[in-house]
Amino acid sequence: MREKVVSLAQDLIRRPSISPNDEGCQQIIAERLEKLGFQIEWMPFNDTLNLWAKHGTSEPVIAFAGHTDVVPTGDENQWSSPPFSAEIIDGMLYGRGAADMKGSLAAMIVAAEEYVKANPNHKGTIALLITSDEEAAAKDGTIRVVETLMARDEKITYCMVGEPSSAKNLGDVVKNGRRGSITGNLYIKGIQGHVAYPHLAENPIHKAAPFLQELTTYQWDKGNEFFPPTSLQIANIHAGTGSNNVIPAELYIQFNLRYCTEVTDEIIKQKVAEMLEKHNLKYRIEWNLSGKPFLTKPGKLLDSITSAIEETIGITPKAETGGGTSDGRFIALMGAEVVEFGPLNSTIHKVNECVSIEDLGKCGEIYHKMLVNLLDS
């Protein structure tokens, strides 16, 4: 299986699919799946290409989810080999997207192919949801496919997202949930004036200082058995004209919360508004909710992937919910059990992104055994 996975991964990496461009990756995948009897449905939205492919018509519906888009390479001169050449050096496959996530995407596809070849009349449905809009805006990708499927009352029972979840060794971590993410863009009004005449102006930085102290020290919750406590970080602050003798007219503050299931986005918005009113600030705030938290509790999917990893590698993975957001947050809206598993994430988005070809082969075996555990038991 390893040779098949690596070969497909190389084919995908050689296509420079900087988000939201697909560069023909999904066409390669669709042609392979169509030969095995998968129903292929294209779902393009604006500049994003999405693929929904499925084999079978009954439940349970087991979906593999992934993305063909990648982040920019950075300075290509710093790479040890061209980032889209997909070279193998000392057992490592190099290239942008090798770990995030064309390698695991290839492993999922080969696993599905091998299972269908051996079980053409399998029970349930095997599906693949693939997008070219995960790394950037994430507006016309998985979320639009999910909305389309929900409008048609289509179900996903279990979903494996191939994000690189492993930390130090393949299979040491699977993600069974993610924190929510919400960003506040806050504008605090002042009155511009000369710094020598502060009584004729109103400095929004000075006015906001007590509020910022409260905002950054407030304990939102204590977390729970599945999630760490909610955290807030200020990402950007800007005020002033650049001159040292002008009191600014406005202060801009951008902050982000990664929040757990102990709070909601509405609770966060309400509490921030209460703080702003308490400190008597003139303000305008715009909120951007990137995703709500989701959690897959121990059950059939988590048991199946855990067992597959144990059988293949001999280690028991730890289920975690840390890290950033993923497209799993959208699929969870369908009521599906969602788990993420993939190769090591130590080089993702970096120069010389790479993945072990041995690990890619093991990923394929693990995904295949997961299918066996879910459909043959």
From Swiss-Prot:
Residues reported to bind Zn(2+) 1: H67, D100, E163
Disulphide bonds in the chain: none
Catalytically driven reaction(s): N-succinyl-(2S,6S)-2,6-diaminopimelate + H2O = (2S,6S)-2,6-diaminopimelate + succinate
Details of cofactor binding: Binds 2 Zn(2+) or Co(2+) ions per subunit.
Role noted for this protein: Catalyzes the hydrolysis of N-succinyl-L,L-diaminopimelic acid (SDAP), forming succinate and LL-2,6-diaminopimelate (DAP), an intermediate involved in the bacterial biosynthesis of lysine and meso-diaminopimelic acid, an essential component of bacterial cell walls.
Similarity comment: Belongs to the peptidase M20A family. DapE subfamily.
Protein name as it appears in the record: Succinyl-diaminopimelate desuccinylase
